[in-house]
Amino acid sequence: MSSQNPVWTTVSTAPDMLGESPFWHPTEKMLYWIDIPGKKIHRASLDGMVTEGWDMPQEPGCIAPAKRGGLVIALRDGIYRAAYWQSELVKIASIDYDTTTQRFNDGKCDTAGRFWAGSMFEPRTERLAALYRLDARDTVEHKKPPKFDIVQKDAILANGLGWSPDNKTIYWADTVDQIIHAWDWDEATGSMSNKRVFQKFDAKPAGWTPENTMGVNYQGRPDGCAVDTQGNYYIAMYDGQRILKFAPSGQLLAAIPTPTRCTTMPCFGGEDMKTLFITTSSFMRPAEEMKAQPLAGHVFSMQVDVPGLPVNFYQE
């Protein structure tokens, strides 16, 4: 089930603390991603000729491109709109959680143009996180506020959001619970039904090390995801130094080794959508690990055989 010796290329010019939320912009031919604790949005061209950063006033949890141009950005205290790169940030939705203990984390747009963002409870002790849906379609012409709803509750650390190519299935993970759920998905209404377990992973017991597995098949913690055109689901396993590729049936197809231990999120890009990008983390990692993996926090890429789904754009 293991992928054979993938060849990874370093894309970024400097490491992030916690790289996340990558997407490939097909028009600009640029890769975007964020550094959450670094409070920054990055973008870069594949040839390395363009590498730019944009400082944020708060931690960005996730970003997505907008059809009218610019970005939609989930910051700690709400959802913001930027009309173009480094433009003014305009808040379009406020959040009702306690911003001292919660922030947005993983998120992206669906094919209808709604923006979905999951939150996390930073102490990781209570189920106060949720999945939010922002529907701003037709709001500009009709001068009305977007609809901002809670779709799912009772999570701790939201991650792994993705959709199947036929728009019939939605995936969402809770990193702390070591679980990925799937639901039936209605693109027209944005509704979820028929919740079921897609994958459940072994937790990391106290004292576990790569050398002393204690008989537990610990593979890391489920983080961000990407989906290819065949419906295969790629999940970054934080602390596991791998990406797991699952068929729509749930069958494990491959375990792809990654350059650093803490891979955070994959995405597809490039002209043919056969470049797999990954963001990684160096945040609060042990000194010995950082010494052994000096490229932790960088963005990497490798080539794959099956193209991925393109990024969905925010519509308003």
Residue ranges and their predicted role:
Residues 2-16, 44-48, 55, 93-96, ...:
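A short helix->beta-strand "capping" segment at the edge of beta-propeller domains
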Residues 14-28, 56-74, 98-114, 148-169, ...:
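Beta-rich, blade/repeat-based domains predominating
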Residues 25-26, 31-36, 71-77, 115-125, ...:
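Conserved beta-strand positions in repeat-built beta-propeller and related beta-rich domains
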Residues 40-42, 78, 129-132, 179-181, ...:
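A short loop-to-beta-strand structural motif that recurs across blades of beta-propeller domains
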Residues 68-69, 84-85, 132-142, 240, ...:
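Flexible "stalk/tail and boundary" regions
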Residues 83-85, 136-141, 183-191, 304-309:
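Short loop/turn segments immediately following beta-strands, especially the blade-tip
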Residues 89-151:
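Hydrophobic alpha-helical segments and helix pairs
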Residues 269-316:
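Blade-level signature of beta-propeller repeat domains, shared across WD40, Kelch, NHL, RCC1
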